Amino acid sequence: MPAPVSSIKIIALAAIGILIVVFAILLAVFHNDLLAIAMPIAERIAKLPMSFLIALVLIAASSIPPLLGQDPLALLIGAVWGLNVGFWTVVCGIFIGETIAFMAYRYFLEQKAQEFREHHEEHYGTFVKIVEEGSYPLIWLIRLSFLPTHFTTVFFATLPELSYIGWAIAFWLSCFKYLVPVYAGYCIVHNKSSAANIVGIVLSIVVTLGTLAFLIVRYKAIKNSTLEDSTNSTSDVLNHLESQPTDSIDLRHLEQTSEQNETDNSERKHLLSHQH
């Protein structure tokens, strides 16, 4: 017997969380190989005037769905442009890119936003309730985690209750999370092994898994509550019908049957009289 759709979706969400963690671990393990490939190109770009603007445009573009690559680019920017310039380049670039995505889906891509709602129709309303319950603290926590922003930004854009200002405040209050990949790139180039970087990665993973677990738990609770309410409503209707007096129902049925029989008999008599 196939698993319920809700269970499949929950398993899918858990799988996404695991993939994010695996990606973060692989990035931490193979960052040297990635930098060895990309560093020569990045160093040539860094020699150009106002080169950080090129990096800003690249990471802004990677923040607009369906393009990818925020974390590797942030790592590279930290390695080439350093901790200070690199961090603000990454944060401003991502903010610009995600602002474009937010505004586009809210005001210019209404059909796409509607398709997004319809594609996730079965579960969209549930997640809206979760966000409404958690309000801005939950929005901030989702922003702070490393859940895919290509999904969360589009989701937030489809919520009329969430203003752009509210979303922007949540972004800036959580932007320090981008220190993790930028500082990792900076440490690699300067041959530093910092405990702070390891702590940052671990905290990011913990926050992401914690947020994902909270969303799954609340999702199941709201789904079960909705199912229970629906069951109770159906039971109330059945109880109401059962409470109706059966005598009056049977009497009406007998009266209708009697009237029908009288009509049939009169028609037969009429036909017989014509035959004679």
UniProtKB/Swiss-Prot annotation:
Regions of this protein lying in the Lumenal compartment: 1-9, 69-75, 174-196
Region of interest (Disordered), residue spans: 257-276
Entry-listed glycosylation sites: 191
Protein location: Golgi apparatus membrane
One Pfam family per UniProt: VTT_dom
Biological role: Golgi membrane protein involved in vesicular trafficking and spindle migration.
Protein's name according to its UniProt entry: Golgi apparatus membrane protein tvp38
Protein source organism: Schizosaccharomyces pombe (strain 972 / ATCC 24843)
